[in-house]
Amino acid sequence: MGIAAVRFKRDNPYAVRRESGCMHGGIMDTEEFWEFALLRYARPGVAQCCVALQDAHGANVMLLLYCAWRAQGGECVRDAALRQATARLEPLDRHLVRPLRAARRAIRRAADALDSPALAVGADRLMQAELAAERRQARLLADGASSLRAGPARACAAQSLAACLEGCGTAPAQARMEGARLAALVFDC
């Protein structure tokens, strides 16, 4: 999934309960982005949309949320910045996040099929490891922010998300449609 299929409930220790603005330029960037990602991922429809884009187009959920985070401040992520961000994430994604996700999903399916609490605990542990790897991706993205231009948040998000999806090989028209859909979910309450 993205953000490790964390179930965002009141008792979730990973769910952040307050909203805050973005401060681009260091450790606060990482924490602000991570908080934004958790909050927005918890919004109705966002997780499902992100996971669908991940599964259908190979989109990186953290990169999608990063585009939305930067758009929150009116910054559009350009193609060159997307390519750089994708290159920064690729080794971690290929060697850690995707294998953890695949293992977690397989174990979760087995736990459900066999009604096995022990396997469910194993899947939950893998989910925590996947979440830690995604947090590392958030750090890489926040630390490498550059090549942005200003504009309205939702419009920038739609544009940046469409560019991100096109980078995954999605047809331009579909990328624009899916980008606009996710931008609406992220920014509309």
What is each model feature region?
Residues 84-99, 163-171:
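Short, mixed-charge aromatic SLiMs
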